[in-house]
Amino acid sequence: MATKKPIIHCDALVVHCMDYRLQKFIQPWITVRFGYDNFDIISLAGSVHDYEMVLKYVELAVKIHTIETVCLINHEDCRAYGREGTYKRHKHDLQDAQFKIKALFPKLKVETFYLHLDGEFEFIS
């Protein structure tokens, strides 16, 4: 008879851009928000710019870590977006990703933030 694996749980999946300029702000903020060891973290160029990749990680985190919250962070001056990376575009993409994730996983809490290069996390939705 197969032995069931124990449930491994963390509260959140955090998705942010890989940009080195953000790390000094992101790591302390996440730790205060979710605790030292209570989150999965994914760092992708452009963060939600590649929604399909983000969705794969959300699905995986739901399956293997029974997450309850997804935290999506885009940022000012994102080079992965290039000239398209306006504040308006980031806000749209964050809200679009939030809507799509909530449609697939209605029980998940999905939070979106825009990180300014001065370290301010602006809550979007």
Regions flagged by a language model, labelled:
Residues 1-12, 17-20, 32, 45-54, ...:
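Divalent-metal-activated hydrolytic enzyme cores
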Residues 37-47:
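A short beta-strand-loop structural module common to alpha/beta enzyme folds
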Residues 73-74:
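Ordered, amphipathic secondary-structure segments that act as subunit-interaction surfaces
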Residues 21-25:
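Short N-terminal binding/cap micro-motifs at the start of the first secondary-structure element
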Residues 27-34:
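Short Gly/aromatic-enriched secondary-structure transition segments
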